[in-house]
Regions:
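Sequence/structural signature of beta-propeller domains
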Residues: 2-5, 12, 20-346
Length: 346
């Protein structure tokens, strides 16, 4: 119990430190990946997480989710860390992530008895701009979200409030990015509190092929998350209800017709929190205020950290699996976690 309390205090201190040093620290870290513009094969060490509840290792059900396993990830490769978003392929194994150093991270989740057991075939590479140079060179390093629509990948970049399109299916991590047109009011987002959530419903879903962006903590006049549907030159504005001091850190689509929001909270007294909400896509309409059911809430009594990425796939048994990842802020007292849950009820 004392060890858990000490870890909580250290993690709170780490988040405070990361918040205070974010402008200088993130940019200097981004500089370290500019020297290589080609993919680098890396080794990721994975320590299994057998239970989600620090107080009851036998417990597996948490709200509407069932814990299937997790990994704490480390690597001796210096640019590794800061995982901000993840997409998992339909096979449930291959994944693509972005980091807040402006890097791609891709690899393969290895399973044993249906549980994550390791990471194989991992590579990192700088995210490239249209000129073939790393986006970090121009200060576009804080990649926070990733989506796929109509065969193209889109990355949301905070601080500069850009969305950049890549032909990843054709060129992989060597794809060159082209900024897409975004609404002028993106310029009014709260600094470093913007494009954490970017997703696109697949064919057959409401709003199929359109980009959905929900801001982290860029709030409207009523204190709710400013949100957008982007469809070429057409823009639909709506808001997501903010509650209980949670802010949006990522999102994904739960086929066929729901939006999953991953959220986090932080305060010196309550420490770190995580929440997932399920919201019907059909509720997204011009100027609407939307909300949804809470699937899970967790704090540092559970195996969480600064949870920043969420993805969905179906396993061979037909179960819906949620994959979550955390951003360690390149801090030695935080962790890069990969957690998996099955959606089993509400």
């Amino acid at each position: 119990m004392k060890a858990a309390w000490l870890r909580r205090r250290w993690l709170v201190a780490g988040v405070l430190f990361a918040t205070l040093s974010i402008a200088v620290g993130s940019y200097s870290l981004a500089a370290s990946v500019r020297t290589s513009q080609t993919p680098t094969r890396i080794t990721i060490q994975a320590t299994p997480i057998a239970s989600f509840d620090n107080r009851d290792s036998s417990r597996v059900r948490f709200g509407a989710l069932e814990f299937r396993g997790g990994l704490a990830l480390t690597s001796k490769y210096q640019p590794f860390g800061g995982i901000s978003a993840i997409r998992v392929e339909p096979d449930g194994s291959h994944f693509l992530s972005v980091t807040d150093r402006g890097s791609w991270l891709r690899g393969r989740i290895v399973y044993e008895d249906g549980k994550p057991a390791g990471i194989a075939d991992a590579e990192m590479a700088p995210i490239l701009g249209s000129d073939g140079r790393p986006l970090a060179v121009r200060g576009w390093f804080d990649a926070e979200s990733i989506a796929e629509a109509d065969g193209k990948h889109y990355v949301g970049i905070e601080r500069v409030e850009k969305i950049v399109r890549f032909d990843y299916r054709r060129d992989g991590v060597l794809a060159r990015g082209e900024p897409i047109r975004v609404p002028d009011d993106f310029k009014t987002f709260t600094f470093n509190k913007s494009l954490e959530c970017l997703t696109a419903p697949p064919k057959g879903s409401p709003l199929a092929g359109q980009l959905i962006a929900v801001t982290e903590h860029s709030l409207d006049a009523q204190g709710n998350h400013r949100s957008y549907v982007l469809d070429g030159n057409r823009v639909t504005r709506f808001s997501v209800q903010r509650s209980d001091n949670f802010d949006v850190s990522d999102c994904t689509i739960l086929p066929p017709a729901d939006l999953l929001l991953l959220e986090r909270s932080f305060s010196p007294l309550r420490s770190i929190g995580m929440r997932i909400r399920r919201i019907p896509l059909a509720s997204i309409k011009p100027d609407a205020l939307i909300d949804g059911k809470v699937l899970i809430v967790a704090d540092l009594g559970y195996q969480i950290d600064n949870m920043e990425g969420i993805a969905v796939h179906r396993n061979a048994a037909g179960e819906t699996i949620l994959t979550l990842v955390s951003d360690d802020n390149f801090s030695f007292i935080q962790r890069n976690l990969l957690l998996q849950f099955a959606l089993v009820g509400e």
